């Protein structure tokens, strides 16, 4: 299957004929990038999770796999105001003037085919059998924001 989610290891793995893309859900429900590159057959790729030994003195979390600093971790969907000082993928401001956003993994869906993105450029497939889609649902419990991250794997690239 082009997209798998290992619930036990909490790893998403997306395969095309030539490439693999993988990310991991931490014990604190943050999404961390694991790998993108040449296709790999392994299903257990948590050994690729990079946990630095020497964390800088910045806010960090400890989720049982060692502490990780948001400023050093390869966050899959970086947001602003949560100790990651790199460029965020989005910025918002709520009605109270707060701009912090922290997205936590909530659930996912894997299905054949691809939803249309109205008004946006997108890849396409001739039939639903040529593409598998992954939707990762994230929530920010502080401001009620719900985010859907969409991924797809095309069989013929």
Describe the role of every protein-language-model region.
Residues 1-10:
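Short, Gly/Pro- and small/polar-rich lid/capping loops
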Residues 18:
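Conserved, mostly hydrophobic/aromatic
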Residues 26-44:
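Short, surface-exposed, low-complexity cationic segments
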Residues 49-144:
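An extended acidic
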Residues 155-157:
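Conserved small/polar residues in nucleotide/adenosyl-binding loops
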């Amino acid at each position: 299957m082009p997209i798998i989610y290992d619930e036990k290891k909490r790893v998403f793995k997306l395969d095309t004929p030539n490439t693999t893309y993988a990310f991991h859900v931490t014990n604190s429900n943050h999404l961390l990038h694991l790998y993108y590159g040449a296709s790999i057959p392994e299903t257990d790729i948590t050994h690729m999770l990079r946990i630095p030994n020497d964390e800088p003195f910045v806010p960090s979390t400890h989720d049982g796999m060692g502490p990780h600093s948001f400023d050093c971790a390869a966050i899959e969907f970086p947001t602003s105001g949560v100790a990651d000082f790199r460029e965020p993928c989005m910025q918002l401001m709520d009605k109270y003037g707060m701009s912090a956003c922290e997205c936590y993994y909530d659930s996912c869906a894997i299905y054949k085919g691809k939803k249309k993105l109205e008004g946006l450029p997108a890849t396409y497939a001739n039939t639903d059998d040529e593409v598998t889609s992954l939707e990762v649902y994230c929530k920010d419990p502080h401001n009620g924001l719900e985010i859907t991250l969409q991924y797809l794997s095309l069989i013929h690239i």
